[in-house]
């Protein structure tokens, strides 16, 4: 189902000056995530930040595409691409956003930590991905609370034309035995059962928004019918007990990253960090 705007039942409207949610707004955000598995926070980030990140990722794209093995998620045109981790492009309002952490701490606990700093590029002419989840249910067939929340940052206006993601609200709680294949893709019979009850939605997402979603939410990348790449920055917050490799960050940001109570699972290194040819253990879509 294609919509003209983010649906009201999934959305909170904010401004870049909002540093905390009042109790009523926090309760609403948590209720949206619990019921639907996806929350759209519009107006969160200043466009001067997203503009710089977008430009840097687009500048890197030719080098990514020259690699012998381009990191592709499922089908052609969906390229996993990490953003630069230079000090000048690591923004506290993005990496340590107080409203984002207020929400993820409320769901995952005060020791939750970000362990992903990645992204993707949906290229013109891309194919349709299979419906999938990014993170598995830990105990198949058993209902359990979330252990991770994906934090997605559109770096341009996402439109129906340029490949705004398809989401399946409420699917994060669906955990029957044998629902998924070995890649985390939803089996066709399960898709049709869910479609009859709650069909998927797609909608424009304005730049400056942040999308928080349960890592188990069904979703897929769709074809980019525009003439320009569609970049996304992606992070994932996990409960402190879930083991993940650390993000590689330059030691020049250690003081403000490590000094924050908004935790980042990071390894700090001297000099430049190779963000283009390192391992890509996460299938961020």
Swiss-Prot record:
Any Pfam family hit: PhyH
Entry's transmembrane regions: none
Broad class of enzyme this protein falls into: oxidoreductase
Molecular function, one GO term: 2-oxoglutarate-dependent dioxygenase activity
EC number annotated for this UniProt entry: 1.14.11.37
Protein keywords: Antibiotic biosynthesis, Iron, Oxidoreductase
Similarity remark: Belongs to the PhyH family.
Protein role: Mediates the conversion of kanamycin B into 2'-dehydrokanamycin A during the transformation of kanamycin B to kanamycin A.
Name by which UniProt lists this protein: Kanamycin B dioxygenase
Gene: kanJ
